[in-house]
Amino acid sequence: VKNEVIAYILKVHPLFLVALGGVLGIDLLTLYSVAPYLAMKQGIWEIVGLFVSAGILMIPYTLLVRNARIIYGIVLTLLFVVVLFGHQSHGARRWIGVGWFQIQPSEFMILALIFFLTATLLHNGKDVRLTPGLFAGSAIATLLPAFLIARQPDLGTAVELSIIFSVYILLKGIPSRVVGISLIGGLAFFPVAWEVLWAHLHEFQKDRIRAFIDPASDPSGMGYHTIQSIVAVGSGGWFGQGLSGATQVRYQFLPGAQTDFVFAVFTEEWGFAGALLFLSLMAYLVWFATRTALECRDPVGFYLASGVSGFFLFGFLINALMVLGVLPVVGVPMPLMSYGGSAMIVSLGSLALLLNIRFYAKR
């Protein structure tokens, strides 16, 4: 099977490999300009991610879905471990130390939830009607980890889980009566829900929302991240400042240059032309995921690929719009680009899942 999978990928999907290689190369190049040691560490994580992806390719996706509840349970347990014993850094408790490195279970919950919702919303691999009980169970399975992750605090990943859940519910189709009741109920309880949510947000999260509404009101405080990101993007011009030429990074004006705002760094260095190239490569990967879903006649493969497509599409859209100041800074990383080992492994593993679906669905 191993040789068959490799031959299939090289023969049928060379453009996919070129696009993926281009994005990973851009990632390392950009991180090198921020700090060479970051590029070296990210390169190691990319290699680890590729090995994990190779493992995913060897296991039929139907077998992975059959064990979805076990996968979900393991990752959910790790989230509780983070609450009790997690490593704390910069006011956030998100990591578990394993030897010389750390893992971030919240990132793995993205893939675990995709498996779990696929298994839950299907019955023995067959599509079934969305019942109130099925909806409630899926919602609880999403909200529980989302709540634990938001309390770390990691609002960005919690938002991503909610988006993945929404994608699945939309795919299942919601009766108009349920939509109407949900809208009326949502509007009626929104003021109360907003007050509860606002009361549980950390102060820096509130600051990000205030900064989104009016970043210029406090340019050295709440609006600093957004303003510096927009300056970085604007100063890139058409063709950028060149490798390691990003002044926002060189003079340390841009916080989170290697994580949330790495796309701003790349745009300042390579300009509009570089940004267009990167977005084109990402758009191709999203298109590949969407096409995988649409071409798969197996409901299991369809739902899995749709979940991956939603994860990549909204992940890169939210991050790009956040960098441009169109959305508030919620901490959603750019897939395959933001620095972080766990996020890189999950992103590469998700793409490997698409190839897995394409290969095994045709056998």
Labelled PLM ranges:
Residues 1, 31, 317-363:
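A juxtamembrane structural motif centered on a specific transmembrane helix
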Residues 237-273, 293:
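Long extracytoplasmic/lumenal interhelical loops at the membrane interface
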